[in-house]
Swiss-Prot record:
One of its GO terms (biological process) is L-tryptophan biosynthetic process. It comes from Burkholderia pseudomallei (strain K96243). It catalyses: 1-(2-carboxyphenylamino)-1-deoxy-D-ribulose 5-phosphate + H(+) = (1S,2R)-1-C-(indol-3-yl)glycerol 3-phosphate + CO2 + H2O. Keywords: Amino-acid biosynthesis, Aromatic amino acid biosynthesis, Decarboxylase, Lyase, Tryptophan biosynthesis. InterPro entries: Aldolase_TIM, Indole-3-glycerol_P_synth, Indole-3-glycerol_P_synth_dom, Indole-3-GlycerolPSynthase_CS, RibuloseP-bd_barrel. Pathway: Amino-acid biosynthesis; L-tryptophan biosynthesis; L-tryptophan from chorismate: step 4/5. This is Indole-3-glycerol phosphate synthase.
Amino acid sequence: MSDILDKIIAVKREEIAAALESAPLEELKVQASARDSRDFVGALRDKHAAGHAAVIAEVKKASPSKGVLREHFVPADIARSYAQHGAACLSVLTDERFFQGSARYLEQARAACALPVLRKDFIVDAYQVLEARAMGADAILLIAAALDTPLMIDLEAYAHSLGLAVLVEVHNRGELDEALKLKTPLVGINNRNLRTFETTIDTTLGMLDAIPDDRIVVTESGILSRADVERMEAAGVHTFLVGEAFMRAENPGAELARMFF
């Protein structure tokens, strides 16, 4: 199979070049400074302290591997449904080319509820970090497979300077070793291989022994049932990023409650 991640990164670099023309850095800085901030990490810890799973509920219309997940897609309604049914935070896809996402979707979802919001995208440049703050994100995703370690460290530092939390995502032990050089407590283990899009939740279970106790493990992708949730919780994982299972349900928030609470 062709390397999907490399294709996505190449497109991101093209998008950044175009965005710099249409929305210069100084303009973005003004927009970013006007945004309020919600505590992403704190929202997860509050759920843990109350004895609940912390669910980062995803607002996602489509994916390259599965196509359109939800035809009737209204981000504000989905966000409200998640908030009403116990989500800790939101994750909103902003990639347009591959996931049919949009910055507008993030803005609409955040305006509809009080939950902190993660910008889910393929970030490879500081411009996108500032862009995330300007659109209202409270956290960004850094994907270890897409970044070398010095750049990842620099992007994290810039994000923190803007008041953004960082979720660093890994898929194997080599990436984990590099991710642990960051300061963020949030370590996401993606059960989906971003180079092949194959998925198994054993990926998370096989890496837990290498993660320090002071980090919050976020299991991502492939959590599709209550049985998957119970398997993770039995292994000590209590933070989940889930999209597909909710997006395919008639009522995303009700499905969240059914799976987790």
